[in-house]
């Protein structure tokens, strides 16, 4: 945690500077009252509702004692729960066991379902975000009854029937969205339909329902958990999808094909009986747009997931490059080609433009300011049907991305490590901007900077009086509930950036990028010198 210290300085004379300084001071005071242990417990609880976290941000001090007691109680309860397993667990000499590929260096024997016996079903329901069930043996799908059967061997006792229910989606705490996810029944049976299709590799079963259609949720709730759950199979796995969508495969097929060598199965649409030697039903998830390497085989991290994106989009990006090069050749535009070559040396900035709420009203001025600083600027306005490879191509080649808080910020995953990500943070969205994009961006190795607007940079400033609570105290407004937050700060607000103030951020980003480039050029030169020396000696 960053420790903040009070500074004594001369009072500024400009009203704008005073407003900015007051906002910074308020942020410092908020950080000063946070307790690390409380913050950890608070963060977990508030994943249940965005507004719940923000609304209770101001009540942390009064609730500190209660939350500490609650945290201590939870710790003792967990210790009592797992103590018998740790101290008295023994392995039966005659038991045939199958480990679901745990990490080689972890204590996976202490985790639920880290070891799954043959002809058994084990469900891990201990995680806050998701349930995951494991089936080992003769596994058969039965779409008509929304079931997956595990055929028990004839030697198995008749009273060992297991029937588990699961909704394979990674937002377990959100009852409203989980109610829309198809529920599967996982059952042990003595007899089942014959196999129509026999697979020699495992199945991973998950839903592409819920919030699918929003790019943040497609990556956070779907693709990253799919990577976490399946990457250790080295593509020798079949994906079985509930609520299968052709458009989803069209959009994400490049990534899915890097995780599986087999075509996916539409669980509801394919009524044949598919048989597998094992199945994982549900997906693991760690945190927002990130991967906990300590929980992964071979310490895979979000950087490894990004490398997979490189591999997935590279063929399509090369095809787009060839098409554009061919078009340039056909147009015979020598002047355009000359301009492109000259612009390649300038640091590139991509501005993610919004057309609805939270739009930058003076976007043209922002572009001109960035160009004046020295950037080559590209403005993108991604739509739901925008090809991801084209967005990847733009962001993978840029040095800086600028955008207002929203789902499109998920595309920071396409940026190269050590690139700069500037997120414009509207009023009332501080926590969400940091939680969902700021922290994950730093984990990916990006240079993250939050540009928190002042009240006068919000369109709400023109709608309400300057002393209105909506402008002066967004936390108390957010405390009224999610619908109020959504209406006021997410759907009802645009931004008009103070160009003079924002230019300082642009200058810092430009200086960082140019220094980084010089270091890279120096390193390349140092690597070339020994080679040239060897050639001379020859």
What do these predicted regions represent?
Residues 2-22, 27-538:
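The feature primarily captures lumenal catalytic ectodomains
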């Amino acid at each position: 945690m960053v420790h903040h210290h009070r500074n004594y300085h001369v009072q500024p004379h400009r009203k704008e500077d005073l407003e900015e300084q007051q906002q910074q001071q308020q942020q410092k005071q908020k950080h000063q009252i946070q307790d690390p242990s409380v913050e950890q417990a608070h963060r977990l609880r508030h994943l249940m509702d965005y507004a719940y976290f923000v609304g209770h941000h101001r009540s942390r001090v009064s609730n500190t004692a209660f939350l500490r007691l609650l945290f201590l109680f939870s710790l003792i309860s967990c210790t009592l729960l797992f103590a018998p397993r740790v101290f008295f667990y023994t392995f039966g000499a005659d038991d045939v066991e199958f480990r679901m590929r745990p990490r080689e260096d972890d204590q996976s024997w202490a985790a639920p379902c880290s070891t799954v016996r043959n002809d058994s079903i084990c469900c891990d329901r201990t995680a806050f975000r998701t349930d995951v069930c494991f089936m080992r043996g003769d596994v058969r799908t039965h779409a008509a009854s929304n079931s997956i059967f595990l055929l028990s061997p004839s030697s198995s006792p008749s009273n060992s029937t297991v029937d588990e229910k699961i909704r394979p989606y990674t937002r377990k705490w959100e009852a409203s969205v989980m109610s829309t996810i198809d529920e599967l029944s996982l059952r042990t049976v003595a007899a089942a339909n014959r196999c129509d299709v026999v697979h020699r590799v495992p199945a991973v079963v998950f839903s592409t329902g819920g919030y699918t259609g929003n790019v943040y949720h497609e990556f956070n709730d779907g693709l990253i958990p799919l990577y976490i759950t399946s990457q250790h199979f080295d593509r020798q796995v079949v994906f079985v999808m509930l609520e299968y969508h052709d458009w989803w495969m069209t959009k994400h097929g490049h990534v899915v094909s890097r995780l599986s060598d087999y075509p996916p199965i539409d669980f509801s649409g394919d009524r044949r009986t598919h048989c597998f030697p094992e199945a994982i039903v549900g997906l693991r998830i760690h945190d927002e747009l990130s991967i906990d390497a300590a929980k992964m085989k071979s310490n895979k991290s979000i950087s490894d997931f990004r490398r997979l994106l490189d591999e997935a989009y590279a063929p399509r990006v090369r095809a787009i490059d060839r098409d554009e090069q061919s078009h340039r050749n056909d147009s015979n535009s020598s002047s355009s080609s000359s301009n492109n070559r000259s612009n390649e040396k300038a640091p590139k900035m991509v501005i993610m433009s919004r057309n609805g709420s939270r739009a930058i009203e003076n976007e043209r001025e922002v572009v001109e300011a960035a160009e004046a600083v020295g950037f080559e600027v590209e403005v993108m306005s991604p739509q739901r049907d925008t090809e991801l490879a084209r967005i990847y191509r733009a962001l993978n080649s840029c040095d800086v991305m600028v955008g207002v808080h929203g789902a499109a910020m998920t595309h920071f995953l396409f940026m190269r490590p050590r690139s700069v990500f500037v997120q414009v943070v509207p009023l009332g969205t501080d926590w969400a901007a940091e939680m969902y994009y700021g922290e994950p961006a730093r984990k990916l190795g990006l240079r993250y900077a939050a540009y928190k607007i002042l009240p006068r940079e919000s369109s709400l400033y023109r709608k309400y009086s300057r002393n209105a609570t909506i402008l002066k105290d967004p936390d108390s407004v957010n405390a009224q509930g999610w619908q109020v937050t959504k209406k006021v700060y997410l759907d009802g607000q645009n931004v008009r950036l103070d160009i003079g103030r924002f230019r300082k951020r642009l200058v810092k980003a430009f200086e960082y990028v140019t220094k980084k480039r010089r270091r890279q050029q120096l390193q390349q030169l140092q690597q070339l010198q020994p080679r040239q020396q060897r050639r001379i000696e020859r």
